[in-house]
Amino acid sequence: MKSTVEQLSPTRVRINVEVPFAELEPDFQRAYKELAKQVRLPGFRPGKAPAKLLEARIGREAMLDQIVNDALPSRYGQAVAESDVQPLGRPNIEVTKKEYGQDLQFTAEVDIRPKISPPDLSALTVSVDPIEIGEDDVDAELQSLRTRFGTLTAVDRPVAVGDVVSIDLSATVDGEDIPNAAAEGLSHEVGSGRLIAGLDDAVVGLSADESRVFTAKLAAGEHAGQEAQVTVTVRSVKERELPEPDDEFAQLASEFDSIDELRASLSDQVRQAKRAQQAEQIRNATIDALLEQVDVPLPESYVQAQFDSVLHSALSGLNHDEARFNELLVEQGSSRAAFDAEARTASEKDVKRQLLLDALADELQVQVGQDDLTERLVTTSRQYGIEPQQLFGYLQERNQLPTMFADVRRELAIRAAVEAATVTDSDGNTIDTSEFFGKRVSAGEAEEAEPADEGAARAASDEATT
């Protein structure tokens, strides 16, 4: 078999393939044997009919069509393996010559990974916001803790923000009662913004057994999106009494003996949370800095697949009702055109990010170890509240393990970029990134690390992008 590659663009090639007819003869023999078992010819036992008679019965052209169709995937795969191209997605195959006894010729056009040269990581500079912790941050955490230990007490006064009320709701559209929108005895914290838009404003100032009518759009049911007249009736009003922030409260709410110790602990928690936020900012800023220095050509089919995935996710909550989706966008002050433009821009950036990080991982010869995969499984399973083994089975059943493998490999490439870069805050202070991104692994340590699967990184990454 012979094959040549034509570069149509930085992201697309045409592979020209020529297969000698002699290489197809074994395929013909196998096909004849299978047909002989299925086709009954008078005077011959099943499986014993001569090839010539089978060919006459089925037709040579039909046989040839079947053989060629069966042979194309493997011959295309062989041509790809013999080249240095890395396909993305499915090829567009066209048979250009197909005659019995002569060489088979076909072309395959396919998007490929563009050749990308990552920049010098040691020259990379990243700047992010500094971590600032004020008394207001600690006060907010303390207030949240006091709220958790607060008690609700019935009061005989009008509703105020922060109260917890018991309410009844009913709604009408054009004078018609909407049974699905009615509820009794709902508990609602005023000011939380939950339940229905406009509800908080409606109940403030009402006393027990008083009602008010306000206008709101229904969010669900057959009248979803329509304006409704909503009646809210307050049945009871309770205020939340908070414990005093003193030593006694510290002993009640924590393992500390004094409020000062509790505040110090809350300050540490705030700092840790802000360090995690800063780490995410470093991660994103590093990717942006890399993208600014590298031209990443975009494979159109890959971008379209990413865009389709975004749209699919957006429509899934509406049973893929695009008309309703378009209506909701208008209600939110947007439009389908604006959504599509924003989604395509995001898809293009995501594709650039993936391709660049894959190229960086190739250049750095990143290997995904068993520990790396285990760490990702444990972290992800905690987010979903399931056991790691259960998550592994779920991913394996849906053939999503290659996607996770590719994501982990890209994350390791990001860590390497962050470690090599100069990272400072906007005040000029150097930031120690080792807590969240780890320390650079030496060449000797990298060689000793056990890879998750020899050669699996590229295969997994390719499968994840098809």
Swiss-Prot record:
Its EC number is 5.2.1.8. Gene3D superfamilies: 3.10.50.40, Trigger factor ribosome-binding domain, Trigger factor, C-terminal domain. PANTHER family: TRIGGER FACTOR CHAPERONE AND PEPTIDYL-PROLYL CIS/TRANS ISOMERASE, TRIGGER FACTOR-LIKE PROTEIN TIG, CHLOROPLASTIC. Involved in protein export. Acts as a chaperone by maintaining the newly synthesized protein in an open conformation. Functions as a peptidyl-prolyl cis-trans isomerase. Protects the cells against high-temperatures and aids in the restoration of enzyme activity of thermally denaturated proteins. Contributes to tolerance and adaptation to host-generated stresses. Has strong immunomodulatory potential and modifies the cytokine profile of the host towards the proinflammatory axis. It holds the Pfam family Trigger_C. Its main location: cytoplasm. It catalyses: [protein]-peptidylproline (omega=180) = [protein]-peptidylproline (omega=0). The keyword Cell division applies. It comes from the Bacteria. Residues 162-215 form the PPIase FKBP-type domain. Keywords: Cell cycle, Cell division, Chaperone, Cytoplasm, Isomerase, Rotamase, Stress response. This is Trigger factor. One of its GO terms (cellular component) is plasma membrane. It comes from Mycobacterium tuberculosis (strain ATCC 25618 / H37Rv). Belongs to the FKBP-type PPIase family. Tig subfamily. Consists of 3 domains; the N-terminus binds the ribosome, the middle domain has PPIase activity, while the C-terminus has intrinsic chaperone activity on its own. It is found in: Cytoplasm.
